[in-house]
Every structure is written in C-alpha cells, then in structure tokens.
C-alpha cells in the first residue's frame, strides 16, 4: 500500500511538473472577432511568430461580446498562460478583463485597439488618427476640397473607431469638406450596406464616403452600386478584399494597416517581456494609402 501511495504521488508530481512546463511556453491571443478578415490575418501573423519563437499560442474569439471577452481572460488565468495579447471588443469594458489578468501577474499587451483604464505593458497598433487624416486628404485630392462626404463609423467605444473618426474630422474641420452625415455601422459589411442605403436616400448629393474599415466600405459599395450613383468610397485596413476592390476600381482607396505585422510584433514584444527586457509602451505600425 505504501509503495502504491508513493507511485501515485510520483504520478501526480509528474503531472504537475508537466503542466507547469507547458504553461511556461504558452501565450494567448484574444481577438474581438474572427468573423473579420483583418483579425484573421492578425491571428495568422501571431501564430507564425509564436511558432518561430517556440511558443504555444492559444487563440480565443470574443465574438464582439465584452462578457465573452471577460470569460476568455478568466479561462486563460486558470490555464496559466504566461502572456496575453488582446484585441479589445470595447476600450472601456476590457478594463475589467485586464485587471483579472493583472491580479494573476500575467502581462497584457493590446493589439490594434487600446484599453482606456488598465495596466498594459505595451500597445501595438497603427496611428489611427493619422490614418483618418490620410483618408480625408485623399478625398480632398481626388474629389475636391468642397466635396460632400459621409462617414461610416465603427463600433462605438473602440479606440480604433474613436481615433479614426478624430483624424477624419481633423481633415474635415481643417478644410471646406462638407460632412453630410456620420453614423455607426459597427465595422460590419452587412450593416455598412444597410446604413449606406438609408444615408444615400437622405443625402442624394453625396460625393464621397469614408468608412472606418474595409468591411463597411464593401457594404457601402453594394449600396452605391445599387443606387447607380457615382460616389468615391475610401476604406481602412487594407484587407485582401478591400485591396482587390481598389485594384478593380470599385473602391477609391484603402488606408492599409499591416495586421499580420501587428500580430507578429505582439508576440515578439510579449517574448521580450517574459525575458525581462524593456519594451516601448506604444509600438507603431506604419500605414499607407493603397489606390489604383
């Protein structure tokens, strides 16, 4: 009986050591949604870098739901991951989730969207304010300084929507552009179509549209095509579908991010943190206008 107890104890100890060893090389990436090509590309970039650096990477989808996001983080603290990369569903709501990770001494890095009130070791993102300004200036250059424009906004409460809108309004307020309407379509293609249909009916003289992501831009494109109007549409993100539409002359332009690089840099910065190295609080990722 004593020998059996010893064997059981040894087995339990072996299991504990195995779990601990596995946790040491495990990171996680929590994405706001995987129902958007931009974030799928971000995931791919993170996975490639994690494999290169020898980490296991857990991927979780928050399905654009802050409560799901919170439960994802709670699950990861139980699983003992060593670092968490998070693309927040909401810049304010994510604070509670990040605090849970902080209490477990798990470093958190934000990707693309920031967190308003949380202890985050680094934020990896494009400068969305500059991107919004780039879109506004492109419209002025191609359509005219007095162009009548509409803006499709992303999910309210996200830093990306707030900052892209801020940048675009900087361009509008510093020019003779006339903003006819600005309404949210939640970064969603179908909502972009539906909202744009209503805005076209209310604003038949619109000349250009700035959509805060390519998914909304592509939805708006369908509405414009159905109306038969000649309206320039500028998107944001530089997704595969967005760039393809630009190359076909359907979208005027897209302000291109590099989501694969955002994901890759997130893992790279987390690796440095785990090795005790210092990382910048903000790691910028370059933007560029893609036009035909």
What residue ranges belong to the model's regions?
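Gram-negative bacterial Sec-dependent N-terminal signal peptides
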Residues: 1-23
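A residue-level marker of the well-folded mature domains of exported/periplasmic proteins
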Residues: 3-4, 21-292
């Amino acid at each position: 009986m004593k020998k059996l107890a010893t064997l059981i104890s040894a087995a339990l100890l072996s299991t504990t050591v195995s779990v601990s060893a596995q946790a040491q090389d495990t990171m996680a990436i929590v994405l706001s949604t995987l129902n958007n090509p931009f974030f799928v590309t971000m995931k791919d970039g993170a996975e490639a870098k994690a494999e290169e650096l020898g980490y296991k990477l857990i991927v979780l989808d928050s399905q654009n739901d802050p409560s799901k996001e919170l439960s994802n983080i709670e699950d990861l603290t139980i699983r003992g991951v060593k670092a968490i990369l998070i693309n927040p569903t909401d810049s304010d709501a994510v604070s509670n989730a990040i605090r849970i990770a902080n209490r477990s001494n798990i470093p958190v890095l934000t990707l693309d969207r920031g967190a308003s009130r949380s202890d985050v070791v680094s934020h990896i993102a494009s400068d969305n304010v500059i991107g919004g300004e780039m879109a506004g200036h492109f419209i002025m250059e191609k359509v005219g300084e007095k162009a009548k424009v509409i803006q499709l906004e992303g999910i309210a409460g996200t830093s990306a929507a707030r900052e892209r809108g801020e940048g675009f309004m900087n361009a509008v307020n510093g020019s003779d552009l006339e903003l006819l309407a600005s309404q949210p379509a939640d970064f969603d293609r179908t909502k972009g179509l539906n909202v744009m249909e209503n805005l076209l009916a209310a604003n038949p003289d619109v000349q250009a549209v700035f959509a805060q992501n390519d998914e909304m831009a592509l939805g708006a494109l369908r509405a414009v095509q159905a109306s038969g109007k000649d309206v320039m549409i500028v998107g944001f993100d530089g997704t595969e579908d967005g760039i393809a539409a630009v190359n076909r002359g359907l979208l005027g332009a897209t302000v291109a991010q590099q989501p694969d690089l955002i994901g890759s840099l997130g893992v790279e910065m987390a690796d440095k943190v785990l090795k005790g190295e210092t990382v910048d609080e903000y790691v910028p990722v370059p933007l560029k206008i893609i036009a035909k």
